[in-house]
Amino acid sequence: MATVNVNRSVTDIFYRYKMPRLQAKVEGKGNGIKTVLVNMAEVARAIGRPATYPTKYFGCELGAQTLFDHKNERFVVNGSHDVNKLQDLLDGFIRKFVLCPECDNPETNLTVSAKNQTISQSCKACGFHGLLKVNHKVNTFIVKNPPSLNPAAQGSSLTEGKRSRKQKQKNDNADGSMTNNSLANNSGGESDGGNGTNQASQTEAEISAAIPEKTAKDDDDEGWSVDVSKEAIRARLQDLTDGAKGMTISDDYDKTEKERIDIFYELVKDKRDKKQLDDVQTHKELVIEAERLDIINKAPLVLAELLFTENIIKDVQKNRPLLLRFTLNNPKAQRYLIGGVEQTVELHKGILMSKVAGIFKLFYDLDILDEAVILEWAQKVSKRHVSKNIAAEIHEKAMPFVLWLKNAEEESSESEEEEDDESEEDNYVSSAGQRGGQRVVQRGIPRAVAGDEDDEDDVNIDDI
């Protein structure tokens, strides 16, 4: 089997850390098509990670569901995927979750703290130990399925481990009771009277001695339980810095995009109802939440739905600072904002359809939408956000402003060309004058003086 370096940035053929080249096979057709990772188990053993981790990483990166069958060592990613692309994704996983950040060696272990919901990485080669700095959707999966967990339980839940511990405890209790019964039978053959009572009291005494009494200290420890309600979590997030908020691990990563958009929708709606959207701190909080939910580009679509009414002109002017936080230097977010504007126009068609050109000009004048984004949008009628008829009508109403933009662009380009031509002519004239001056200097005398010398030469000839 062909092998490659675990760290593929190392080209040394004698590099000691090798792994099998990933093999994939596409099975099925239509909606049931899937990519089977044939040798994922061998690859996982070579890099020292459970096979579920890179498989889940593929699913997060490709937006596909994953299936695990530990008994048959079968790992599947839904959809048809090229093996070379999967190998590149595997390199990304190794870079983020396997290689040591200090020495780049793959001799590392991951340790999960279920209490703190953190992942630590330790290196056997250089001794490095620290928190994993990578913030990825697969982090949540790793926290729920730590490396120390039985591989067959990974991908399901921790309940199996708890269930096995309870079963073991039950078996131990059963063994203990059987031992006590045998002791009672052995000693109980002599007498059935007071001896039985003494044996029962003796057994109770042994059980009481085995179970430690509760102390005040134990009661104090029980009072330190963590409140995991939504209000408590939101309060703790408020105490974090902006950078730490983006690094927190949340179960929201496992939710679909629609569910994450709904979470952001409810947050914006709550801030709007409480009239907090004028606060700069609220703007920062919304941006951080959108980044955490990985919907920063689609957030303007939510803002348009909640903030724009039939008085969209005033709404845009009022909420310009908030809109700029999402659309500034972000063409994708601007395109989704245009989609939100289209939906608003469709909702208030009788009032806003005739004002479309002015609405787009307002967005342009306030620097919320860039010229290039508007011109790109105008090239094609799309029914992504509204019906095709409404989209075509909006494009038609916006055409005067689009033509104005195009003409302004052409005029600016023509004026720039004219300025360039004039500057070239000026440079040519000045250079010609300089060249003429140089010729006079080279002759060493002004033109009039040269004429006088010619006259003097004529006189001298006549005299001769």
Swiss-Prot record:
Residues 254-415 form the W2 domain. It comes from the Eukaryota. One of its GO terms (cellular component) is cytosol. InterPro entries: ARM-type_fold (IPR016024), IF2/IF5 (IPR045196), Transl_init_fac_IF2/IF5_dom (IPR002735), Transl_init_fac_IF2/IF5_N (IPR016189), Transl_init_fac_IF2/IF5_Zn-bd (IPR016190), W2_domain (IPR003307). SMART domains: eIF2B_5 (SM00653), eIF5C (SM00515). The modification Phosphoserine is found at residues 9, 412-413, 415. Residues 410-427, 451-464 have a biased composition (Acidic residues). One of its GO terms (molecular function) is translation initiation factor activity. PROSITE patterns: W2 (PS51363). Residues 145-203, 409-464 are annotated as: Disordered. One of its GO terms (biological process) is formation of cytoplasmic translation initiation complex. Belongs to the eIF-2-beta/eIF-5 family. This is Eukaryotic translation initiation factor 5. It comes from Drosophila melanogaster. The gene is eIF5.
